[in-house]
Amino acid sequence: MTSTVKFGDVYVCVFPFTSGQGAKVRPVLILMDLELDCLVCRITSIPHRGFLDLTVSHWQEAGLEKPSTIRLSRLVTVEKQILKLRIGRLAAEDFNHVRSLWNEKFRL
């Protein structure tokens, strides 16, 4: 189990399906530390499809096995104990793209 996570860290996680039935082990991006939980979004190898998708330019630096897409449309709060392994961190360029899109689309 991980006690401290940081915005921009990439972990392998048991990510629940939207239906609530089952899960898949996949990389996730940490968006927010919520003490016992954290807010994450999924990372997929499926190419960019929507306005809340961002291509990871420096995917190898982030610890990803292949070119990947961050899906800010797929947010979920997970218990830190299901984070299996920190595999990397977003490069500054990718980190700034995520931060900009987050601030633009989720500003309340």
Label the predicted regions.
Residues 19-25, 30-60:
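Compact nucleic-acid interaction/catalytic patches
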Residues 59-108:
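C-terminal terminal-subdomain/extension
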